[in-house]
A protein has these predicted regions:
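Bacterial N-terminal signal peptides
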Residues: 7-17
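Short, compositionally biased P/S/T/A/G/V-rich stretches that sit at domain boundaries
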Residues: 25-48
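A glycine-anchored, Pro-Gly-centered beta-turn/N-cap motif
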Residues: 49, 73, 112-114
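Short, well-structured beta-strand segments within conserved domains
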Residues: 51-55, 105, 114-122
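Short amphipathic, basic-aromatic surface patches that mediate peripheral association
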Residues: 56-67
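Short coil-to-beta strand junction motifs in C2/discoidin
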Residues: 67-75, 135
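Short acidic/polar inter-strand loop motif in beta-rich domains
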Residues: 84-87, 123-131
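Internal, hydrophobic beta-strand segments that form the core of beta-sheet-rich folds
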Residues: 112-127, 135-141
Length: 144
């Protein structure tokens, strides 16, 4: 049994290193001067419980996830995030990181009453943020 323990420990460490290597994927270079922004609502707006968020993009095009076309990506809406997600792998799909992998440029959003922050982050065909990140200004809305 004691002879198996070092081999088991080595196997676990190699497995962990493999997962770390898989988690970090190459990032696509962003075109110079590419920018993403929220068209609507405006920063500081008061909105109804359900409201429209419209996405804007300059210097790049929008394409669905999985489409390998130069200088294109798709939107991810960051909701109430204090810290940006990791930029070295695919963005997680959570209630705070909403994927628009079909190439959508707007959405209807329903949030609880109160203050909320919204920010856009463009992802490549694999949901990986560009390098450097194409990230909008964070806006704040108040839901009535």
């Amino acid at each position: 049994m004691n002879k198996l323990l070092p081999a088991f420990a080595l196997s676990l460490s190699m497995l962990g290193a493999s997962f770390a290597a898989i988690a970090e994927v190459p990032r696509t270079a962003a075109p110079e001067n590419a920018s993403v922004y929220i068209i609507e609502p405006k920063d500081g707006a008061t909105v109804d419980k359900t409201f429209t968020v419209r996405f804007g993009l300059k210097g790049m095009g929008v394409a669905p996830a999985g489409v390998d076309a130069p200088d294109t990506g798709h939107h991810h809406l960051l909701i109430d995030l204090d810290q940006l997600p990791a930029m070295n792998g695919p963005l997680p799909a959570t209630e705070n990181v909403v994927h628009f992998g079909k190439g959508q440029t707007e959405t209807e959003l329903t949030l609880a009453p109160g203050k909320h922050t919204l920010q856009l982050l463009l992802g490549d065909k694999n949901h990986v943020p560009f390098d450097p990140p194409v990230l909008s200004k964070k806006i704040t809305v108040t839901v009535k």
